[in-house]
Amino acid sequence: MKNVLIICAMKKEAIRIAERLKLEEIEENLFKSTKCKHMEEEKYNKNNKDSNITLLITGIGKQLTAINLTQFLCRNEKPDLIINIGYAGSTDIQVGKWVNISRVYNYEWEIPGEEKYVMLAGGSQKLELLDNSEIEKVECYSSESFVSETDIEEHVAFDMELHSISLLCEMYEIPLISLKKISDNLSLDKYYENLEEKEVFELESCLDYLDLN
């Protein structure tokens, strides 16, 4: 039986995913499957192939994400897989499109003598990729604030949490998948405007790409 941790930054990103997976909120910002919650009382069969799924809402930004994910990992059994789901901006990727992140960089990291965006401590390892040609694989840069302009010209995504998740997954040796829906092309005004559109706002459709068993 596989233990899967899904990570979202905001409740508005997480709530419909939790509903579709039939997860219960057991404490603020933490949801678990009923089977996971009642496993001991029901003497749940450990050979069952279904996954135990937990959903954690970390808050926005790399710092909050690092703090809340670290607390979770210290207090709970290590997951077999972490899946990060959320919105991302992009230089040129179509709004409303799902992408699978192949690698993530720290957007603010610029230290003399070191490669820009790449922390020697880790966090920029390659992520797990879905075996699905329908979803594009792209790199992502994690910033501590909303990116509205950039010198980066490549076909990439921008978020505010993934590098912290990746760094901790590398430290704890946990496989990481990240699926991002493009919410804007580096425009904060368009971000809020686009999220009014159902096909952009909804995130639960990403579950169709995942095998959670």
Predicted regions and their residues:
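Extreme N-terminal starter segment of soluble prokaryotic enzymes
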Residues: 1-5, 14, 51-53, 80
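Short, ordered beta-strand-loop transition motifs
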Residues: 27-30, 47-49
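N-terminal beta1-alpha1 ligand-phosphate binding loop
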Residues: 4-24, 29
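Glycine-rich phosphate- or other oxyanion-binding loops that anchor nucleotides, phosphorylated ligands
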Residues: 35-213
